[in-house]
Amino acid sequence: MRLLKFVCLLASVAAAKPTPGASHKVIEHLDFVPEGWQMVGAADPAAIIDFWLAIERENPEKLYDTIYDVSTPGRAQYGKHLKREELDDLLRPRVETSESIISWLTNGGVNPQHIRDEGDWVKFSTNVKTAEKLMNTRFNVFKDNLNSVSKIRTLEYSVPVAISAHVQMIQPTTLFGRQKPQNSLILNPLTKDLESMSVEEFAASQCRSLVTTACLRELYGLGDRVTQARDDNRIGVSGFLEEYAQYRDLELFLSRFEPSAKGFNFSEGLIAGGKNTQGGPGSSTEANLDMQYVVGLSHKAKVTYYSTAGRGPLVPDLSQPSQASNNNEPYLEQLRYLVKLPKNQLPSVLTTSYGETEQSLPASYTKATCDLFAQLGTMGVSVIFSSGDTGPGSSCQTNDGKNATRFNPIYPASCPFVTSIGGTVGTGPERAVSFSSGGFSDRFPCPQYQDNAVKGYLKILGNQWSGLFDPNGRAFPDIAAQGSNYAVYDKGRMTGVSGTSASAPAMAAIIAQLNDFRLAKGSPVLGFLNPWIYSKGFSGFTDIVDGGSRGCTGYDIYSGLKAKKVPYASWNATKGWDPVTGFGTPNFQALTKVLP
């Protein structure tokens, strides 16, 4: 039986990957059908797929030099964020490069009306038959063995040698999967005694029993401060996976916890067919959580809910063995939409509470999307991500066929151009919450801005967990905020929600408050935060030295499948930066004194 299964596997791989000719070069390749998936047959030749092609930049350092120049206090260009046209000029490939790619597509049968040249990216739509000829591959239908969802994908694709040096990636091709909201626990409706507490009682509780905007204002030194209504201080909230923010629930939340904000609302940015449907049985908890705390803590700021259709891709591992049926790429769709907005329409803060294991995405995809976060940073956007809810890891094994024991960093939290937010719990003192993800990237090297801080932690750590992580990788999270038992109105009822998905929007609102403080003094918004945080801003955060994360328990917390067990696996909160709470939680008054 095992031999038969192995022969069938070889047959499926062979069917999925034709032999590339001498005139083609392989761009991406999977050695085997990802675990949990089965090839069930050839794709319909007439099926239409929307592709994104990322053009390899001739001088990638130009983007990195620019983001550090405009984001590092003390440099001559600090705060001089680029306009969209300036960013386009920075990234625009040579004319002959673009022409060669467009020519390849049109000569290969793609309708010119279905090609959109966006400078360093090209979007094109075509049918499976044409795509197979273009990329010298065969697209097949792959079925998820857990939920019978099917996807059109391939295990390998190629492009002509003549243009191969210009092609960083084409997707969706080899990507299997989805994102997850980073909310580790959704509680039942709250007890009557909590529901009946007054706003003043919640503030006095200092977030011990339930987190509300009142206690966060008290805990983090915001007081009654509100932002001013300005066009140059906008907040964007990311929405994926058909999560829809409900206006009625926001109204209930503000009436209950922020009565002075009653009547304030948010606008919608609908991307690639995204919706924000009101009412109905669909999921809204994550979207409501994000919107209620962003609006509640900065209610005069202009807030936009960016709802993007589709579900993100991955190469499945034990943490994420399944996905929904949709060929769109939401991160790419959202990011390409945002970087093309005029600078006066961009959010100055973008908060996202979604992520996946870093290893579940091909390296070309993580690099391309991380560079898009950097592009937003050059235009003055502070990109905020939750760090994740699996501690050092959940499955704690590699998905390369070796199943080696390994901690699992979370992406996009591990991208060096985002600010990653860990979680805390309790007060007097705050402690690291056990589910707060953190660690070290296996994809991105440690950026110079955090080199000294991370070296200090590694010296304390010594040889513990040696071999389970890359000590030279980008370390995360950067900072933290409360992450346990947030009061949220969902479908008309108050519910408690935990996860770093709560920490991220709370921090985003505080960053918007800092931007408001700077703008009132004639200074620009903060933009990409990390160079400032690691050089000076860290002194405005309360260091968390108690508690720690946990993970690698032997069972994956999402799928329930048996996984690698690492006894006592944890990152501990320590003095200074640590990979569970970063530099700690915000003290608004202290932060205003160390702003650039």
Curated annotation (Swiss-Prot):
Keywords per UniProt: Calcium, Glycoprotein, Hydrolase, Metal-binding, Protease, Secreted, Serine protease, Signal, Virulence, Zymogen
Highest taxon listed in the record's lineage: Eukaryota
Residues of the Peptidase S53 domain: 210-596
Residues making up the signal peptide according to the UniProt record: 1-16
One GO CC annotation: extracellular region
Compartments reported by the entry: Secreted, Extracellular space
UniProt record, GO biological process: proteolysis
Cofactor annotation remark: Binds 1 Ca(2+) ion per subunit.
Glycan attachment positions: 265, 403, 572
Name under which the protein is recorded: Probable tripeptidyl-peptidase SED2
Molecular function GO terms recorded: metal ion binding; serine-type endopeptidase activity; tripeptidyl-peptidase activity
Pfam families: Peptidase_S8, Pro-kuma_activ
Annotated EC: 3.4.14.10
Taxonomic lineage: Eukaryota, Fungi, Dikarya, Ascomycota, Pezizomycotina
Cofactor: Ca(2+)
UniProt key word Signal: yes
InterPro entries linked to this entry: Peptidase_S8/S53_dom (IPR000209), Peptidase_S8/S53_dom_sf (IPR036852), Peptidase_S8_Ser-AS (IPR023828), S53_propep (IPR015366), Sedolisin_dom (IPR030400), Tripeptidyl-peptidase_I (IPR050819)
Catalytically driven reaction(s): Release of an N-terminal tripeptide from a polypeptide
Residues engaged in binding Ca(2+): 543-544, 576, 578
Main location, first listed in the record: secreted
Propeptide, residue positions: 17-203
Its biological purpose: Secreted tripeptidyl-peptidase which degrades proteins at acidic pHs and is involved in virulence.
Broadest EC class assigned to this enzyme: hydrolase
